[in-house]
């Protein structure tokens, strides 16, 4: 295979000895397929933390060690260790959640997660504030409803996303099933997870424990998603591997356009890191889905940078090797790709409220600001779950869909929504409905500034500006993160804010309305007053100078307010 490809630099990839690569590669190789000393660390009651190497390995199990950063300095003054706790992320392909699973997850969140639950931008749940001795009860509780946390984090294939669009129920169901098939295929196969968390015995076997990943897994995380045009709700161009469904004349999926190399993360003041939108390289029929997925991931596994983790994502492999070389490498493994087929996107937002699909079912999308569910909201949704005969869908915009409600059952669900006050989306501005924020403070160890806790307040102030210029009904996407890693995909928002320090943010403008274009830095390291001043000026021009139906991001480029980003590698210019 590889000997048919043009020569390429392999000085940083899996072909090199471990001593020439990042220390993380040796850690993975020596971990006994992600077992490490995790089981022993959980037994240590002297500390509420786990050993450093196990912190990294536990990510492959869907678990992050964190601490309460609001009290970190005070605990340091008192000579106490940080208030360690853990975030646990569920594997939930396509964001599909049965009512039984919802009730169990809600129960676990209230018992072990500080009575709060977070829906994420990748259509799954996160438990926060879980103490070390409660990790096993949470994971075993999930196992009771056949859920797990395998590969929700770590250098592997993360949770697989799929469009949530009730207007195409048959296509949506087909796509969700394919997302689960791919997810089940690409997760690590090590039995270490079962041994550590379920207490199973290790069984000797002559079969390879990780036939695809090997001992060192992927160079970095690898994200896969499926989308049905015209709604780009999953932000397909932010995926390492994106499948754009193309419908046939029979109403079924005829195949997929393949988009590769998307990714949001960057590091401030490090110009060789940058976000990138995925490149469409061809089309395949559904029967080739698994083989092509393996081929794309295999190319990144074998040629991705394992020496410098800041350059280890697939987007950098593509830009270093060249898109044509990468496509050749994929075709070398999986066969030739057909030319990409036409498609178009119109939005990446959710459709709120009730929608009736052509199969006669009804679906209600509930706005959940920044995906945060407190005890009161969990209890209200639990009452719906007890009577709902369909299922729930978590959306990529951190909202919740009550799916597949029969006409006869709609009045009952509607009464519960109205009676509980959950129907409130029409009370929010269009800007708020099109906003997202990551968790950031106080739990995320990477955060430099607030995000989830601050964005609602900032939006209220921006709403005043929009009203002043009669723009309150204009759909504008706004996303905020507490650091430049980009978990809420801020670099493709029309307005993006990324944290630099407490109360300070970088302001980005010019992203595409449906996630098709990166934005560019407009103001650096500024506080609230400067953010509002900058937005006031730009929105004032937008109000008077925009063309009919011109989106805000498009206007900022046409008006010369910001230069268009044509490729991610030029976004720092």
UniProtKB/Swiss-Prot annotation:
UniProt enzyme class: oxidoreductase
Binding locations of [4Fe-4S] cluster: 438, 444, 483, 487
InterPro entries assigned to the protein according to its UniProt record, in alphabetical order: CysI, NiRdtase/SiRdtase_haem-b_fer, Nit/Sulf_reduc_fer-like_dom_sf, NO2/SO3_Rdtase_4Fe4S_dom, NO2/SO3_Rdtase_4Fe4S_prot, NO2/SO3_Rdtase_4Fe4S_sf, NO2/SO3_Rdtase_FeS/sirohaem_BS
GO CC terms in record: sulfite reductase complex (NADPH)
Its EC number(s): 1.8.1.2
Pfam families named among the record's database cross-references: NIR_SIR, NIR_SIR_ferr
Reactions accelerated catalytically: hydrogen sulfide + 3 NADP(+) + 3 H2O = sulfite + 3 NADPH + 4 H(+)
Pathway in which this enzyme or protein is active: Sulfur metabolism; hydrogen sulfide biosynthesis; hydrogen sulfide from sulfite (NADPH route): step 1/1
Cofactor descriptive note: Binds 1 siroheme per subunit.
Keywords associated with the record: 4Fe-4S, Amino-acid biosynthesis, Cysteine biosynthesis, Heme, Iron, Iron-sulfur, Metal-binding, NADP, Oxidoreductase
GO molecular function: 4 iron, 4 sulfur cluster binding; heme binding; metal ion binding; NADP binding; sulfite reductase (ferredoxin) activity; sulfite reductase (NADPH) activity
Gene Ontology biological process terms in this record: cysteine biosynthetic process; hydrogen sulfide biosynthetic process; sulfate assimilation
Cofactor(s) this protein requires: siroheme; [4Fe-4S] cluster
Binding site for siroheme: 487
Quaternary structure (record): Alpha(8)-beta(8). The alpha component is a flavoprotein, the beta component is a hemoprotein.
Family: Belongs to the nitrite and sulfite reductase 4Fe-4S domain family.
Function: Component of the sulfite reductase complex that catalyzes the 6-electron reduction of sulfite to sulfide. This is one of several activities required for the biosynthesis of L-cysteine from sulfate.
Protein name: Sulfite reductase [NADPH] hemoprotein beta-component
Naturally occurring in which organism (per UniProt): Nitrosomonas eutropha (strain DSM 101675 / C91 / Nm57)
């Amino acid at each position: 295979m590889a000997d048919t490809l043009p020569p390429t630099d392999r000085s940083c990839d899996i072909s090199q000895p471990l001593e020439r690569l990042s220390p993380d590669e040796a850690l993975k190789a020596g971990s006994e397929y992600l077992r490490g000393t995790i089981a022993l660390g959980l037994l240590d009651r002297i500390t509420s933390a786990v050993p450093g190497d196990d912190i990294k390995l536990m990510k492959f199990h869907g678990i992050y060690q964190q601490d309460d950063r609001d009290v970190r300095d005070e605990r340091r003054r008192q000579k106490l260790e940080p208030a360690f706790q853990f975030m646990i992320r569920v594997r939930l392909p396509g964001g599909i959640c049965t009512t039984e699973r919802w009730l169990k997850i809600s129960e676990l969140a209230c018992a072990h997660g500080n009575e709060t639950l977070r829906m994420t931008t990748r259509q799954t749940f996160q438990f926060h504030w879980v103490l070390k001795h409660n990790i096993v009860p949470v994971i075993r509780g999930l196992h009771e409803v056949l859920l797990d946390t395998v590969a929700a984090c770590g250098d592997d294939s993360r949770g697989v996303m799929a469009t949530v669009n009730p207007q195409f129920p048959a296509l949506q169901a087909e796509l969700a099933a394919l997302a689960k098939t791919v997810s089940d295929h690409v997760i690590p196969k090590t039995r270490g997870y079962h041994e550590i968390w379920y207490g199973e015995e290790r069984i000797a076997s002559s079969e390879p424990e990780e036939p695809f990943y090997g001992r060192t897994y992927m160079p970095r995380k690898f994200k896969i998603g499926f989308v049905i045009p015209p709604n780009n709700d999953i932000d397909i161009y932010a995926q390492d591997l994106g499948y754009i469904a193309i419908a046939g004349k029979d109403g079924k999926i005829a195949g997929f356009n393949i988009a590769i190399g998307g990714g949001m993360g960057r590091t401030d003041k490090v110009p060789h890191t940058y976000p990138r939108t995925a490149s469409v390289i061809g089309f395949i029929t559904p029967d080739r889905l698994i083989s092509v997925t393996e081929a794309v991931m295999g190319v990144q596994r074998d040629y991705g940078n394992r020496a410098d983790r800041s350059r280890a994502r697939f987007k950098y492999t593509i830009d270093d090797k060249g898109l044509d070389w990468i496509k050749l490498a994929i075709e070398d493994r999986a066969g030739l790709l057909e030319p990409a087929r036409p498609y178009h996107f119109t939005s990446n937002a959710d459709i709120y409220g009730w929608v009736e699909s052509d199969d006669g079912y009804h679906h209600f999308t509930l706005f959940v600001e920044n995906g945060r569910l407190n005890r009161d909201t969990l209890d209200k949704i639990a009452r719906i779950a007890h009577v709902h005969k369909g299922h729930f869908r978590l959306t990529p915009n951190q909202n919740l869909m009550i799916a597949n409600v029969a006409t006869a059952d709609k009045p009952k669900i509607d009464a519960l929504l109205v009676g509980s006050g959950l129907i409130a989306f029409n009370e929010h501005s269009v800007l708020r409905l099109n906003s997202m924020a990551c968790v950031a403070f106080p739990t995320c160890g990477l955060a430099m500034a607030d995000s989830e806790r601050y964005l609602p307040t900032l939006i209220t102030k921006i709403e005043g500006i929009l009203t002043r210029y009669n723009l309150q009904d204009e759909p504008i996407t706004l996303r905020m993160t507490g650091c430049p890693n980009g978990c809420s995909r801020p670099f493709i928002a029309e307005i993006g804010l990324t944290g630099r320090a407490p109360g300070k943010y970088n302001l980005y403008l010019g992203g595409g309305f449906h996630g098709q274009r990166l934005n560019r830095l407009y103001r650096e390291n500024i506080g609230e007053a400067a953010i509002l001043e900058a937005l006031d000026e730009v929105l004032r021009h937008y109000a008077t100078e925009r063309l009919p139906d011109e989106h805000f991001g498009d206007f900022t480029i046409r008006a010369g307010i910001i230069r268009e980003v044509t490729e991610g590698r030029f976004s720092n210019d």
